[in-house]
């Protein structure tokens, strides 16, 4: 298991290092680096890591996926990798096959609700949906008369109001106006919107942990290289504390 996890994470890190290093991203103001990065990630099966092979994915473990998310955080990858992984995981809970391409999830806010109407369509408003404008499909958990359902929706059928968060990442509002889903199935017993929120929190926490790890490495390296008064600043007692 540990060997498999190392292979998955090493593959992700190599792709990030080759196609999304800081210098490449900084010099490419138009974001042309994103398309080849996404293609490489897709060819490696990483966006659908948590989807079973039966449903079009790679079928790796949660732990493998967590390692990939930590690596994505270390490289500060601004593509919907985490969102697509989470969407695939959500669809897998109901046995729905995942399509190719970028995905995201809705709702992303615990106060928002998507409702399944009597005619099977979906209605509601979801705020703060990451990368909704870039997504080709959205995985949705909705409440219906018979309990929670999980649905796959064509993003082109939705109205998306694009916004940015403090990190300048897509943080959109998605309006469901009696939208007919591609596929809809009942959620597993005991699985509801709070289940998605909890998993989403884990996903973001792993990305944050990876980013903090990278920040620590950069700070320690800088302190060892930066010289003041003829010695590295890491040697100063104030810095060591």
What are these regions (language model features)?
Residues 13-17, 213, 217-220, 224:
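Structural signal for well-ordered, non-membrane alpha-helices
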Residues 24-32, 189-200, 217-241:
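Glycine-rich cofactor-pocket loops
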Residues 77-94:
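N-terminal glycine-rich flavin-associated loop
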Residues 6, 10, 31-35, 84-88, ...:
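An alpha-helix initiation/capping motif
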Residues 1-78:
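Amphipathic, small/basic residue-rich leader segments at the start of a protein or domain
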Residues 4-8, 29-33, 130, 204-211, ...:
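Short, contiguous, pocket-lining structural segments
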Residues 65-68, 72, 87-91, 205, ...:
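Buried hydrophobic packing segments
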Residues 89, 96-213:
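FAD-binding core of flavoproteins
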């Amino acid at each position: 298991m540990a060997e498999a996890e190392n292979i998955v994470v090493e593959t992700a890190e190599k792709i990030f290092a080759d196609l999304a290093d800081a210098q490449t991203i900084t010099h490419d103001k138009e974001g042309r680096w994103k398309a080849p990065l996404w293609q490489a990630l897709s060819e490696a099966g990483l966006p659908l890591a948590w989807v079973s092979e039966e449903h079009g994915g790679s079928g790796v473990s949660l732990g493998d996926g967590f390692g990939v998310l930590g690596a994505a955080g270390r490289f500060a990858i601004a593509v919907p990798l985490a969102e697509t992984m989470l969407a695939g995981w959500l669809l897998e809970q109901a046995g729905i096959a995942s399509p190719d391409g970028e995905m995201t999830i809705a709702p992303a806010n615990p106060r928002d609700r998507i409702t399944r109407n009597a005619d099977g369509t979906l209605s509601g408003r979801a705020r703060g949906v990451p990368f909704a404008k870039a997504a080709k499909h959205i995985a949705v958990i909705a409440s219906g008369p018979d309990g929670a359902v999980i649905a796959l929706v064509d993003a082109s059928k939705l109205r998306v109001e694009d916004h940015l968060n403090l990190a300048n990442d897509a943080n959109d509002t998605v309006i469901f106006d009696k939208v007919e889903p591609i596929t809809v199935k009942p959620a597993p017993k005991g699985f509801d919107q709070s289940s998605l929120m909890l998993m989403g929190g884990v996903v973001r926490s792993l990305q944050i942990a990876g980013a903090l790890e990278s920040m620590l490495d950069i700070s320690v390296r800088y302190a060892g290289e930066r010289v003041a008064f003829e010695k590295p600043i890491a040697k100063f007692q104030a810095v060591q504390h």
